[in-house]
Amino acid sequence: MPVNRSTFLRRGVAVVAALPLLTLAACGYGSKSDSKETTKVAAGAKKIDGLDSVKIGYFGNLTHATALVGIQKGIFQKELGATKVSPAIFNAGPSEIEALNSGSIDIGWIGPSPSINGYVKSNGKSLKIIGGSASGGVKLVVNPKKIKSLKDVKGKKIATPQLGNTQDVAFLNWAADQSWKVDAQSGKGDVTVVRTDNKITPDAYKSGSIDGAWVPEPTASKLVAEGGKVLLDEASLWPDKKFVITNIIVSQKFLKAHPKAVEAVLKASVEANKWINANPDQAKAAANKQLEADSGKALKANVLDPAWKSIQFTNDPLAATLNTEAEHAVKAGLLEKPNLKGIYDLTLLNKVLKAEGESTVDAAGLGTS
C-alpha cells in the first residue's frame, strides 16, 4: 500500500493525543478498569491459545456499550476461559491506536476515523477491523437562544471532540455541504470549529464559550440536560439511518498469533449484542454500572435514557459507510485518498455468525483477499 503524503491528520494527531496521554500517563496508555467481579475466572476453565490475558481497550462512551456490557456481565471472561480479560479505558482514538501498536492492548473498540488513520499511517500493517459494534448516537446540539435553525449555525462556535476524529470529520463535511468554508486545521471560517474534549464540553456549553456541539452520546444528552436542543441527528444524513460509530480492531500481529483468542472475543461481542438487543433496559443499566466502575460516576436517568435510544448495536461493521467517512475526510482536506483495501478481515466474525445461525456480513470490497 503506498505511503500517503498527508496521512489522516498527521499534524493534528500529535496535538490531540497529548491531552489523553497526559491524563492516562499514570496507567500507561489506558486507565485500567476496576472490574474484579466481572473478570473472575470460572473454576476448571482453560486458557485460550496459552494466553494469560487478553488486553481489551474501549472508551467510556455509550457508543462502546458492547464492550461495557460484555465486561460487566462477564461475557468476555466466560468465552476466554482461564485467559484473563484485562480492560483498559481510553479518552481518544490516537492513544488507543498507539496502545495497539505498542502491544499495550490486543483488541479495541474504536471509531472509524482513528481506525482509518492507524491503518493508513502503518501502510496497512498495524491493524484489521474485525467486526462491528454500534451505529448512530451522534447529534448536533445547540443553544436554542442563539441557534434556532440549521442556517443559524453559520458564524457560531461549534465544538467537536478533537481534530480529525469521527465527529469532527462529519461536522466539517456537513458544513461543506452548506457551502460554508472552514479551514480544517485551524477550525476557522464561516463557522468556528472548537476542538474540545467530551468531558469538558458540557462546562464549555454552560460557560457560553461554545454555541453548540457535534458530539456522540452521552455527551449530546448531557448538553440537552443543560438546556441544549437537538438540531440534527447525524443518522438522518445516512441511507437507512445507519453509519458506523464503533467497530472492533485487532493488532495484525495478535490476530496472526492468537486467532482462537480473537474468535473468542468476537463470539463474546456477538453474544453481548444479542443480549443488549433482547434486554434493552437491563443492558442500559449494565452499561451504566460499568461506566460507574470505570469512572466512579454513573449517568443520570435524564442523560442515560435518551442517549441509549439513539444507538443501534450491530455486528455489521457497515463497511460502506466507513469508506464514505474516509471520502468525507478527503473532501475536508484531512486525508489524501487512501487505499483501504484489506482494512477488514471478517473471516472469524462470519465464522461465529454462521455458528450462531445469524446472517454474515461483508466488507464492501475492502476485505482481505
Q: In which residue ranges do the predicted regions lie?
A:
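Bacterial N-terminal signal peptides that target proteins for export
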Residues: 1-16
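Bacterial signal peptide processing site
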Residues: 28-31
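Pocket-lining segment of extracytoplasmic ligand-binding domains
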Residues: 187-190, 199-289
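Conserved C-terminal helix/tail region of periplasmic/extracytoplasmic solute-binding proteins
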Residues: 327-369
